[in-house]
Amino acid sequence: EATDSRRGDGVYGKATHAMNLLRERKLLYGISSCYTRANFESITSEEYYDSLIRMGAYFIWYFHYMPVGNDASPELLPTPEQRTEVYRRIRRYRAEKPLFAMDFQNDAEFVGGCIAGGRTYLHINANGDVDPCVFIHYSDSNIREKTLLETMKSPLFMAYHDGQPFNDNMLRPC
């Protein structure tokens, strides 16, 4: 219900069907989950985590909601207390369960801060536009027109490269 309300009717069913097919074929896969102020309890719960293990997932990427764009909802940004709780839960699950979790923002201390702009991460959208980050919907390159190396040398990606690290607080959201 929560997935369909965000992504559209039937999306959750399609996603779980795909996960079942991957599990049946013994293929390695993981999922990405976005937690908000409204859904953080359910999406980081032990019940949710265990359901992913039963469905055969090997890893999960957690992203906390970032209000981006004209239709953004800043009130959905998780509170500092919620982020702290997610931080604790993920570390406990890592120690106890056979599903590896990564927390895009809360694990910044392990990767030296922001990994965007091609430092070790970039985002390619459905149109082929190469964005510095999934949260930054701006691109000066398209994968159909440039190689990844050309993209990494573009003015936008070089500006990211030259500006990193962006701050000393590894847990500060962008």
Q: Where in this protein do the model-derived segments appear?
A:
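Radical SAM enzyme [4Fe-4S]-AdoMet core and its adjacent flexible, acidic
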Residues: A2-G117, A126-N127, D131, F135-I143
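Flexible mid-to-C-terminal extensions adjoining Fe-S/redox cofactors in radical SAM and related proteins
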Residues: F135-C174
